[in-house]
A protein has these predicted regions:
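Glycine-rich phosphate-binding loops of nucleotide-dependent enzymes
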Residues: 2-254
């Protein structure tokens, strides 16, 4: 059953179509890959689905809800969260502080919380969750370090950790291993497989085909703002239409 359903999604910038009639489904409990040549519309699709930019046409349904055009924070509360290729955290805050900041339903410093004594309890709960998340992602040893001190791979892990702190049903990852050394890339892949086995669904944009082959089934290929084809990685890689799209030849997208 599809957890995410996208139908007829379209978005243009200054008259240039970035996505044009995009249809895609992401089944619950999968790691689905989203690949395609540069300019295929992958990041625009992420931006529209996650509410960063409104669609010109089309619909997005998640977990049975119509989330088309909703604000990003509303979509996150519904259980769908995305990460970015370039980390968007708070570089001067520590790793644990970054994680706590993204915790679901974090209370403010309101008078009611102070009177009832609940603010501190919630802060302690968030801290415990942040520690558990950092430990899981092998970030606890740098938990008190500023996020700006992390390596590129550690920043990718922190992006995943922040997403986990929102209690997501599904995470959209934008190039989670770009610029990461092979050892840490493998570790990130291990984390994603483990999280999938625990019930979290993923949609991943990635240009490293080894990672796509290892992690993703199915794989969706985009070209010219639409879905070109979908299937197992081995079949996708052998498809001459996909090969032509990557080599810059004009692919026929029905």
């Amino acid at each position: 059953m599809a957890l995410l359903e996208v139908r007829g999604l379209a978005r243009a910038y200054y008259g240039v179509r970035a996505i044009a009639g995009l249809d895609l489904d992401v089944a619950a409990g999968t790691i689905t890959g989203l690949i395609g040549p540069n300019g295929a519309g992958k990041t625009t699709a992420f931006n529209v689905i996650s509410g960063l930019v409104p669609p010109d046409a089309g619909t997005v349904h998640f977990a049975g809800q119509d989330i088309t055009g909703r604000r990003p924070e509303e979509i996150t509360r519904a259980g769908l969260v995305r990460t970015f290729q370039i980390a968007r955290g708070f570089p001067r805050l520590s790793v644990l502080e970054n994680l706590m900041l993204y915790g679901a339903r974090q209370p403010g410093e309101g008078l009611l919380n102070a009177l009832l004594g609940q603010g501190r309890t919630r802060e302690e709960e968030l801290f415990e969750r942040a520690v558990a998340t950092a430990r899981r992602l092998n970030l606890l040893r740098v938990g008190n370090n500023p996020a700006s001190d992390l390596s590129g791979g550690q920043k990718k892990l922190l992006e995943i950790g922040r997403a986990l702190m929102t209690d997501p049903k599904m995470i959209m990852l934008d190039e989670p291993i770009a610029g990461v050394n092979p050892t840490l890339s493998g570790q990130i892949g291990d984390h994603l497989l483990s999280l999938r086995d625990e019930g979290i669904t993923f949609l991943i944009i990635e240009h490293h085909m080894d990672a796509i082959a290892r992690l993703c089934d199915p794989v969706i290929v985009m070209a010219e703002g639409r879905k070109l084809t979908e299937g197992r990685f081995a079949d996708i890689a052998a498809d001459h239409v996909v090969q032509e799209a990557y080599m810059g030849k004009r692919a026929h997208v029905p």
